Amino acid sequence: MSQKIILNNSYSITKSHLFHIVDPSPWPVLTSFALLLLVIGGVSFMHGYKFNIYILSAGIISVGYCLYSWWRDIVKEGIVEHQHTSPVRKGLQIGMALFILTEIVFFGVFFASFFKSSLSPVGLLDGVWVVKQGIWPPPTIKTFEPFDIPFINTLILLLSGTTVTWAHYALEEKNQKDCVTALALTILLGIFFTTMQAYEYYHAAFKFTDGIYASNFYLATGFHGAHVIIGTIFLIICYFRAKRGDFTTEGNGHLGFECAAWYWHFVDVVWLFLFTFVYIFGS
């Protein structure tokens, strides 16, 4: 089956298939090196090595630039070159679903560590694992009140899940104004959540190095917070694309927004588990 593809409204090519043959791209290799630089910078920062802040900053900037350029090319493939045919979109959807599946496993490890530590509180004593009074959380840890800031953050994320769904329905109804408004509200809620989380960390009564409880807490909630920031950036991109009119309802021409919504709902669900087990059960 052949398909005509218009390039920049000036000329067209005809493909003999609907599948996407990926063009040569420098971004996978460059992103790998940028991530390596980021890891080196992070390790240097944690150990206080010389020039650590410069290496870390270079890593963050490099990763950000590579991802921006890579995703820009993907958007160009879909909008300008019209290479995102039905099988290509299906492949991208499957890829996003598999990515979220790996994220579920990723957070599952943190929950497994938390439950192992909480249900069987043990510690190292002269190289031997011994039961530590059977108390969880440890007596030296002053936990957060779950129905204070954590509960407010729960309401914020639940409301943001509602607004991103509103944006999706508005897009399906070809209501660009409501779609843009709902996306803006979702972004503001995401920023508000991150601000509240930072406030909570700032006033925490324990540090990352204060035992297994603190390590589990900061790893689980910290990585979730990082995912909220990434999801917020994802939605900001969708906001500007929606204002520009990039998204359409014909042929699922809003796959980028759909993937962002999936990711955001995943972040919501993870937080519900964190709130239930880490904050309520853990306190």
Curated annotation (Swiss-Prot):
Enzyme category, top tier: translocase
Biological processes annotated in GO: aerobic electron transport chain
InterPro entries: Cyt_c/ubiquinol_Oxase_su3, Cyt_c_oxase_su3_dom, Cyt_c_oxidase-like_su3, Cyt_c_oxidase_su3-like_sf, Cyt_c_oxidase_su3_a-hlx
Family matches, as PROSITE patterns: COX3
UniProt GO MF annotations: cytochrome-c oxidase activity
EC number: 7.1.1.9
Catalytic activity: 4 Fe(II)-[cytochrome c] + O2 + 8 H(+)(in) = 4 Fe(III)-[cytochrome c] + 2 H2O + 4 H(+)(out)
Protein family according to the UniProt entry: Belongs to the cytochrome c oxidase subunit 3 family.
Protein name from the UniProt record: Probable cytochrome c oxidase subunit 3
Lineage: Bacteria, Pseudomonadati, Pseudomonadota, Alphaproteobacteria, Rickettsiales
